[in-house]
Amino acid sequence: MAKSVWTSDKIVAQLDSGAHWSGGNLTYSFPTNANWVAYGEKAGFSALNSAQQAAATSAIGMWDSLIAPKFTLTASDTADIKFANTTTSIGYAHAYFPGQSPTAGSVWLNPNYGANSGTNNLVDPQVGQWGYQAYVHEIGHALGLEHPGNYNGGSPTYQKHALFQQDSQQYTVMSYFTADKTGADWIASDGKRYYAQTPMLYDILTIQSIYGEDTETRDGNTTYGYNSTAGDAVFDFTQNLHPVICIYDSYGIDTLDLSGSSYACVINLDPGSFSNSDMMTSNISIAFGTWIEDAIGTAQNDILRGNAIDNVLSGLNGNDILIGGGGSDTLYGGEGNDTLDGGTGADTLLGGAGNDLYTVDDAGDVIIEGANGGSDTVQTALATYTLANNVENLTYIGTGSFIGYGSAQDNVLKGGASHDQLFGGNGNDTLLGGNGNDLLDGGSGTDILQGGLGNDTYVVDNASDTILESAKAGTDTVQTNLATFTLANNIENLVYIGTGSFDGIGNALVNTLTGGDQNDTLKGLAGNDILYGGGGDDVLDGGAGTDKMFGGAGDDTYVVDNARDIVTEGVNAGTDTILTTLRSYTLGAEVENLTFVGTGAIKANGNALDNVITGGAGNDTLSGYGGNDHLIGGDGKDILIGGAGADTLTGGAGADVFRFSALNDSNTLSYDTITDFNAAELDKIDLSQLDANAGARGNQAFSFIGAASFTGVAGQLSFSNGFLSADVNGDGASDFGVWILNVTSLTAAQFWL
């Protein structure tokens, strides 16, 4: 069953025995006789040797640096804390709490634990050994600290006797249980196990709650570790090669420097936190309330973590991870592929040489990268971000929409799951939109754009740009200022955003192609496409499929190859032309001209406008309907029907028929003109649908009188001076007429009357 984690206040209450020294400063001594001893230790008394006194003095110094009272060495056997050896009434070592009796505050050591005891040596204890830790432990008792559990001597076990999770020497030197019980590993690079060399986290917190803090301890700018200025060998890692310490510091801009170590480190500058060095874990801690500002790692792959104030973290060489925490931090990655995260606050991040990864979470963060300093990446959750010079890549790690701008380098920009806008700038960039409806603009350079899922928009300004889209990944649009562009596979729409003329080509999907204000050519290819010409004289070709084409302003040309194609033109929007291969076609509203470009024959119908209808090489039937139309038959045996209005009829080669269906198709208000009547080609003028005598029942045929004048008989048809006229009511005046150019005479055989 897992043990509970106690709060700091609860642990302090557990460690505080309630017995304290009072009256200001404290004294300690090394008595040379046992006259003051009232208990069983007296019989086996002996004074400490010089090595023991040095160890005791060192350990006293550790405690002295923590609390407001100052320790003074005295020769008196009435000192507050007295150190002595005994071989009686003792196991390994023990001490008495503060009090009024002569024995109160005394620390007793068993000299039988000497050189043969290895790390348990109490006769010549070395810093880092169990024996030295025992000195620190017993002084804690002499100052009023209790064990963290209900045990005293014997052989208690962590599982059975520890009351809370933090009961180990990792947290308090007053514990009986080694640091590995709570996950620390104090086996160092030399393969040996080391022990606490100072009071630990909760020792410091408790002793300062009793006696107050020493506000003069290392109150300047202090460096701990290598290049130490702490003034104590235990904090100088050129002397203390295998540190197991807790750092207390009162003031100043302080540094934890592990630069001299050959082994990777983990540094955490948070008060109450642990750091790893010399192949150990959780062997360096920082006291609660102590603020260390700066950290220096090793040449290996380190992890450095700041705290809530302004930190300077230096990773040196190696692939380091630097995390600033709160405050306005400065992070130096050094050589290697480093990860730099300033945390909250306006931070300055310098990755150095190598492929570095920056996490930017504050708009005030500044990244400084040198030229040729590797391929570097920024990841950010900010809503908008612009890459600094010499930083190549940008990845959005937030949850909302994102606007990202590249730099002059070759960038890789990655969006997130929402609607992002990525702008590559200069360089040959790769833009990855991810999910969402993204806008990707590679800028100048040869770019690769991949929108991912969603309805994406690509801005293409280089003919070498590449767009990658998967099938069924949304409805996507290309915006381009190039003079010509063809949609890649799986992209639906194309919009021209330039200022000149444009040639745009679709693909096999359902495309929407939009031109600009100049003379554009849009080709839809397969699919049911929509084409918008915009301003200018445009050519719109929907290709296969049922297409919709909107020419806009200008004289537009439409290519129609499907009977279901729809052409939409506005009023007074230019003179527009249909090119079609269909066998039958009728002009829609506001479209003026129709040209057959197929291989067979066409039945072509105009509308109420002035149309130009042009047939092909087959036997075409062209009908102008309303308006002053021009019908051009081309090759073949064509039938031309001008309809209402003053029409111009050009049959072209072949035996053509010029058909008139109503008197008002060509009367005194709007005479039609036949431009190329050729009797040798067997052309005919078809008047068979006209009633030659309005006064008689039925449809009467005309009587051709050659070049003679009308004689007042209804139904006479005359041709003179290039004008064909008919009198249908016998009044001697022309009721119907047609101009026939370049013809001097006609015969009845050239009519269908």
Positions of the model-derived regions?
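Zinc-dependent metalloendopeptidases
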Residues: 1-299
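GD-rich hexapeptide-repeat beta-solenoids
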Residues: 25-36, 159-167, 172, 177-186, ...
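Secondary-structure transition/turn motif
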Residues: 30-33, 85-88, 111-114, 260-262, ...
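Acidic glycine/aspartate-rich repeat arrays in secreted/surface proteins
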Residues: 77-85, 146-171, 177, 183, ...
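Active-site-proximal structural scaffolding
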Residues: 132, 167, 200, 240, ...
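Short, surface-exposed beta-strand/loop micro-motifs that present aromatic residues
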Residues: 161-164, 244-247, 349, 449, ...
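Short beta-strand elements of solenoid repeat domains
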Residues: 257, 294-296, 303-305, 312-317, ...
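Residues in Ca2+-coordinating acidic/glycine-rich loops
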Residues: 297, 306, 730-732
